[in-house]
Amino acid sequence: MRIYVCVKQVPDTSGKVAVNPDGTLNRASMAAIINPDDMSAIEQALKLKDETGCQVTALTMGPPPAEGMLREIIAMGADDGVLISAREFGGSDTFATSQIISAAIHKLGLSNEDMIFCGRQAIDGDTAQVGPQIAEKLSIPQVTYGAGIKKSGDLVLVKRMLEDGYMMIEVETPCLITCIQDKAVKPRYMTLNGIMECYSKPLLVLDYEALKDEPLIELDTIGLKGSPTNIFKSFTPPQKGVGVMLQGTDKEKVEDLVDKLMQKHVI
């Protein structure tokens, strides 16, 4: 059994966000991190590896520097990594990205026992579309909002979170599960041995030439020009006013608050 974990290197949006003239993010100007929801997918895959001895393959689409992220995941416990990288793939929207990743997984092989884990959504786009689109392209069942995954005989038992609770779902393999951050799923750190060994583990690079003949990919709908989604406008919202911390006793703070509200004609 193999688990493909689809991960994405995203800009750290907690800092200043820069936008290119074409509406895409200026990723080079921002620090890169592993997408938070993807960290949960990594941890749940590694937990299953601990329990079943399965193989875990980290897979990403991105520029060559994304190799460093894959090495980090290997240092956490993944067995190997796959980097999908080509200029022709740059600027792909979710529809194009899901095609490319599906084609890569199809080329690598998806057996009847295999699974694909994705983070629910990426913080740079927040669409939550790529995971479900991969499942549709590969014609396999999918479960979203997974917060707990167990192998149960020939089935997979998934704890799917809801707004007011959760539901338990049994799904056959091969399947795709999108994972969310949950207090019960705490991503592990890289180990010292893992760091020392991660550069000796295999990392496969798939470029345009490797994937262009795959049946799941339509060459006229990939990349920035081929993507059917057009960004009409992208911008950084203006900074809001700075908050004010009131000091003193409770009585003094209440009086100060009333004064400030009266100055602004709120009361």
Swiss-Prot record:
GO cellular component: cytoplasm
Keyword terms of this UniProt record: Cytoplasm, Electron transport, Transport
First-listed, main subcellular location of the protein, grouped into a coarse class: cytoplasm
Subcellular location: Cytoplasm
A GO MF term: electron transfer activity
One Pfam family this sequence matches: ETF
CDD domains: ETF_beta
Chain's role: Part of the ETF-acryloyl-CoA reductase complex involved in the pathway of L-alanine fermentation. The electron transfer flavoprotein (ETF) serves as a specific electron acceptor for acryloyl-CoA reductase.
Full protein name: Acryloyl-CoA reductase electron transfer subunit gamma
Source organism: Anaerotignum propionicum
Lineage: Bacteria, Bacillati, Bacillota, Clostridia, Lachnospirales
Name of encoding gene: acrB
